Amino acid sequence: MEVLPLVSGICCILGGIGVILHTNPINKIIMLALLEIGMIGLIVSCYYLDIAIVSSLCEPICTVILLLGYLKYLTTVKKKKRYGRNLPILSK
């Protein structure tokens, strides 16, 4: 029995369960990254190395974009609390 599909499957299952159960968005993004790592491992175990290279290059970029979007959301919420309902409008 090969070890790579087994470990990758466990990563996928743990990542999926973590995404469902966690309520903190940062933890959800981390668990989504764990799920993506498991998927890359399963792709490699099927010998689709070209697809694994592309997905391993795209996965960190997508994770960083998700983190930046969430941090932007947090700063917007904090500014709205600071200004109350009169959030300054920068454009019409």
From Swiss-Prot:
Keywords: Cell membrane, Membrane, Transmembrane, Transmembrane helix. It is found in: Cell membrane. Its main location: membrane. The keyword Transmembrane helix applies. The keyword Nucleotide-binding does not apply. It is a multi-pass membrane protein. The chain crosses the membrane at residues 1-21, 29-49, 51-71. GO terms for cellular component: plasma membrane. It holds the Pfam family DUF2108. This is Uncharacterized protein MJ0526. It comes from Methanocaldococcus jannaschii (strain ATCC 43067 / DSM 2661 / JAL-1 / JCM 10045 / NBRC 100440) (Methanococcus jannaschii).
